[in-house]
Amino acid sequence: MDKSKRPFLKSKRSFRRRLPPIQSGDRIDYRNMSLISRFISEQGKILSRRVNRLTLKQQRLITIAIKQARILSLLPFLNNDKQFERTESTARTAGLRARKK
């Protein structure tokens, strides 16, 4: 049999299904901070459904719970842990300006 006429066979790899991020016993509630904090980015943004691997209903409930927690000041609207490094950038530009003069 010619090499060009051989059927292309793809090797099958084993597939391991990931566990769902929300178990059946978990209650989606604005007070459940350990659950809610898993679905928020470092910046404080709500992660998308594709990233969270949630169903549409679960994502809707998580979004509502996060918004309620933000309004009640349980969660910040923005997480500003990363401060802008203005000191380095201004120091660099100030040094360049001083050299040109």
Swiss-Prot record:
Organism per entry: Panax ginseng (Korean ginseng)
Localization in the cell: Plastid, Chloroplast
The keyword Amino-acid biosynthesis belongs to this UniProt entry's keyword annotation: no
PROSITE patterns: RIBOSOMAL_S18
Major localisation: plastid
Biological process terms in GO annotation: translation
Subunit organization: Part of the 30S ribosomal subunit.
Organism classification: Eukaryota, Viridiplantae, Streptophyta, Embryophyta, Tracheophyta
UniProt keyword list: Chloroplast, Plastid, Ribonucleoprotein, Ribosomal protein, RNA-binding, rRNA-binding
Single GO cellular component term: chloroplast
One example GO MF annotation: small ribosomal subunit rRNA binding
HAMAP family: Ribosomal_bS18
Designated gene of the protein: rps18
Family as reported in the entry's similarity comment: Belongs to the bacterial ribosomal protein bS18 family.
Matches recorded under Pfam families: Ribosomal_S18 (PF01084)
Name of the protein in its database record: Small ribosomal subunit protein bS18c
